[in-house]
């Protein structure tokens, strides 16, 4: 049997397969190993990938990008609000759910984000089937460490809707370590690994402890203000200023011209990871005027120096948060396409001069390869070199129960603080007046790192038809068990009568 690993990022998606004892990325039908996570809608078809991205200049209002940023979120979510404000494809709330409004001229339809993600997963499945055949559908999906329960559920549902059998969701930094077999080279030793992931829209950092082949997340941090798109935008703004200098026209207010410059800047950025200079030529950029500009790597590095500095300061901040110094880190794993940038790699080497920088696997392929290896482990491949590796995932957010204090005000009790090693089990006793016949246990999550954190309800358990008591309180015992994949099982039992209700919030099948 064979297995599949899929990484759906904000700007791109990548699929790897495990077969015959090896894991590797599969190229799509265009010959590319990474597929743009873009879906375009036309009158008669849905286009996924590079063709959708290339057509966005002509069809921007019906082209969905960065769907991962809105998956499983509500209109009240600050990140969803930011996404809605920036999206060129109209996002509205319909029947309490966020929907893309697609107008192809013939009809207007409303598409939910999960369906967009389903199309991308279908493209990944089609790509995997090109080498494995149509019977291989077992998959491990990667998720960011800071994804909440609703985001994980939405991602899993989209993958299942595409026809995948989801074995597990795995956190991205754990997948990165699996790809390099970290923990197997010195299975009895203890080491600290920094996973540096610079993706299309964000910078994610994780410090992982590897001890006797066991992985544990010590700390993690994500900055949504640093990503590959920010480097591209910086270069695009420079190109716009060069056009203005040469032709006395400011095109920064022209959306079509700026999209052309952004596309050219993205190509140049990729070229500058291997070349000393890149040429940006645009035919008829503005009012019939062609634009030809050569950008050196040195110029690119100078323009982006504030972004490089932010990346390094983010690393220092995460180390300080753990009381670590650079000497406490044994290896650095590079992930995400933008971590290919030579200047950034050099700055990381300067910060960790005695540390091995792992980049032999293409950074945008590391995470899906790790997911494919995990899938191979789960379906019982006996000849995997990392078959004995064991990961301990951690809860990414605080998990809380809601109660009331003596004044009647809401009070939250944290049962699983962020960073709790999984699996884990907690008990909580909820007291309720004996005069009521139903009791509700409400579950919330919050970002424990945020001083202005907000609790978000994600589930509840209701005990109904309880016998009323004239006096006193009733005790309800809640037992919460969180599995390694982050799924949660909750039982609530009336201690006096034994009446019980249970729910499971499943993350992977």
Swiss-Prot record:
GO biological process terms held by the UniProt record: 'de novo' cotranslational protein folding; chaperone cofactor-dependent protein refolding; protein refolding
Pfam families attached to this UniProt entry: HSP70 (PF00012)
Main location: cytoplasm
Cellular localization per UniProt: Cytoplasm, Cytosol
Effect of residue 85 to V: In a breast cancer sample; somatic mutation
GO terms assigned for molecular function: ATP binding; ATP hydrolysis activity; ATP-dependent protein folding chaperone; heat shock protein binding; protein folding chaperone
Family of this protein: Belongs to the heat shock protein 70 family.
Function: Component of the ribosome-associated complex (RAC), a complex involved in folding or maintaining nascent polypeptides in a folding-competent state. In the RAC complex, binds to the nascent polypeptide chain, while DNAJC2 stimulates its ATPase activity.
Protein name, entry field: Heat shock 70 kDa protein 14
